[in-house]
């Protein structure tokens, strides 16, 4: 199993879920610019991120795998499936961004949370709010601290990734997918309003509502593990 994390998190977001899937060899990769991966310059695209992930898998000599992606990780997963479908045994997308170009342009104008360094330290409260209120860590201080630290580390990289996301067509990419697919999303996930597109794009996909706001793999890990195992038994 290969796991691709959301922005601005890191592969740490999958530790709980992976612990519930001991029967599988699981690999969670830090996307370039996140976690412990090196930064990359310029204006990388989703295609670039996908190719970096494939380079890692090639170095590990992994030729076939179940692919799981969350938010931006789901976008990268779609690119990988579209271009290297023979490698993908199954595709699981959590909170995939199935917005139209018009919807993305509107969201782009409304997305304004900034945690670039400020002399007065106010950016630290901004990122604390991001982790707790927006992502959904809430009163779980350990989770909130982890997500805060991941976000601070990825402050520049998050902007790169968001720019890449605005310019990638997840709807068209999902339509092109061939692998057996499981699509999950929490009702309070920021991507939930677009979930109806999943059925229109892939009527044969299994679509399930889960819990956990934007941190489902942490906050609804047991349920996701059950759904994932049931899904894999069917394919």
Write out the residue ranges for each language-model feature:
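Flexible "cap/lid" loop of the alpha/beta hydrolase fold
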Residues: 78-82, 89-120
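Conserved HGGG/HGGXW glycine-rich cap/lid loop of the alpha/beta-hydrolase fold
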Residues: 1-38
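Gly/Ala-rich beta-loop-alpha elbow adjacent to hydrolase catalytic centers
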Residues: 69-77
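Post-His helix in hydrolase/transferase enzymes
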Residues: 217-231
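Residue in the alpha/beta-hydrolase core beta-strand immediately N-terminal to the catalytic nucleophile
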Residues: 30, 66, 89-92
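Conserved acidic catalytic loop of the alpha/beta-hydrolase fold
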Residues: 47-65
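Conserved loop-alpha-helix segment in the C-terminal half of the alpha/beta-hydrolase fold
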Residues: 181-220
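Conserved alpha/beta-hydrolase catalytic His-Asp/Glu region
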Residues: 102-103, 118-175
